């Protein structure tokens, strides 16, 4: 598909995807910024989903590496969640390919308000680490279930995935915000690539647009990861509230 984007619009996209990477690495929810930006630039919904996954996957790779390097994750839990999210996201992306543009837009309109309520309800998350460091069958199944559910959401919708992962890992598994964010990075990395492989096989990624945006997203993720790792909860909590405001703002805009 021949998609032409002007130089000023391309500059706008590069800036917005960089900012999205910054937000995503700190608290999740970068898709709340990048998805509307791609749509605003004129990409059809399916191409928007695919190209956004490409840039997001590139950025999340570097963010995950930063958290791993700093030991800010429970690798066993993260890998189990990643296995679930890979399967869920692949299924979600295949479902998206079967839907029309109109249905996709309606789905976003229905699901995002629910996402807003969940984030608002759980905005004051505990930051103490209540995990005892062991991994039994119950925890393993819970990690797989978290990954499967959030991966399915990420493959079908996307925005807020990282935030939901933080909520799940703190509320259900007792991790502190920093470790929950790291676990979420592994989960999100797997779900991003599962969806991306599906979109690549369908030829939906617009590389002339996606490559510059991917580079910008990588830079944003590296900077955001640094702040999240050094500042911890003092930085992550406010960023999660910023994500909430962006989500609610998008809902209001969609209703106008």
Question: Where would I find each of the regions flagged by the language model?
Answer:
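Residue-level signature of the transmembrane alpha-helical core
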Residues: 14, 18, 22, 53, ...
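Small-residue hotspots at the loop-to-helix junctions and early N-terminal turns
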Residues: 46-50, 181-185
């Amino acid at each position: 598909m021949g998609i032409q984007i002007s130089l000023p619009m391309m500059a706008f996209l590069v800036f917005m995807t960089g900012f999205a990477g910054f937000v995503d690495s700190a608290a999740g929810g970068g898709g709340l910024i990048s998805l509307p930006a791609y749509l605003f630039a004129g990409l059809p919904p399916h191409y928007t989903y695919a190209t956004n996954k490409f840039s997001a996957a590139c950025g999340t790779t570097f963010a995950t590496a930063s958290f791993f390097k700093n030991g800010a994750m429970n690798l066993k839990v993260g890998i189990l969640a990643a296995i679930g999210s890979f399967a869920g996201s692949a299924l979600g992306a295949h479902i998206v390919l079967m839907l029309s543009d109109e249905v996709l837009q309606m789905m976003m309109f229905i699901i995002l308000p629910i996402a807003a309520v969940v984030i608002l309800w759980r905005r004051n998350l505990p930051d103490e680490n209540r995990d005892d460091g062991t991994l039994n069958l119950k925890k393993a199944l819970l990690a797989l279930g978290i990954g499967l559910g959030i991966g399915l959401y990420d493959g079908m919708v996307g925005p807020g995935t990282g935030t939901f992962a933080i909520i799940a890992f703190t509320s259900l598994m007792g991790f502190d915000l920093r470790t929950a964010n790291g676990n979420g990075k592994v989960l999100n990395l797997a779900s991003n690539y599962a969806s991306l492989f599906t979109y690549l096989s369908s030829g939906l990624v617009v590389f002339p647009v996606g490559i510059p945006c991917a580079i910008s997203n990588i830079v944003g993720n590296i900077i955001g990861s640094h702040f999240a790792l050094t500042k911890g909860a003092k930085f992550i909590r406010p960023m999660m509230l910023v994500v909430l405001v962006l989500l609610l703002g998008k809902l209001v805009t969609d209703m106008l």
